[in-house]
């Protein structure tokens, strides 16, 4: 089982820990309470940018959980549009419903949160 916890930007890995405009989530594997991933994102009014996602062994389910956590965080703060700019997890982002729009993966948060998961259920 995994747990995703919002963190202050200072708790993110460098160089993200130096950018006060960022928000973040850290994922933990509850079997041994070890850190298994993190993501960084920025809220920009009604839109957000997911700029960094990292998971141990590039685990798709962990990446999905981090992306969904970030989307939920933004959605709860009146953000409507999400742009996925991270280098990792692009395949997972596409499964969730992000679509290429002028070279940037984009989607509206309500639709993205309804997207297919990595297990295809």
Residue ranges of predicted features:
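Short, exposed beta-strand/loop patches in secreted or surface proteins that constitute
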Residues: 40-43, 82, 97-98
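Conserved GNAT acetyl-CoA-binding A-motif
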Residues: 74-87
């Amino acid at each position: 089982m995994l747990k995703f916890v919002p963190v202050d930007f200072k708790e993110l890995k460098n160089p993200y820990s130096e950018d006060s405009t960022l928000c973040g989530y850290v994922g933990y594997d509850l079997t041994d309470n070890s850190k298994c991933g993190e993501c960084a994102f920025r809220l920009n009014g009604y839109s957000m940018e997911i700029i960094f996602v990292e998971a141990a062994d590039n685990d798709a389910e962990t990446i999905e959980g981090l992306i969904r956590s970030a989307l939920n965080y933004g959605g709860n703060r009146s953000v409507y549009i999400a742009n996925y700019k991270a280098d990792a997890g692009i395949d997972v982002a596409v499964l969730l419903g992000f679509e290429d729009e002028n070279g940037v993966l984009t989607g509206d948060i309500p639709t993205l949160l309804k997207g297919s998961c990595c297990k295809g259920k």
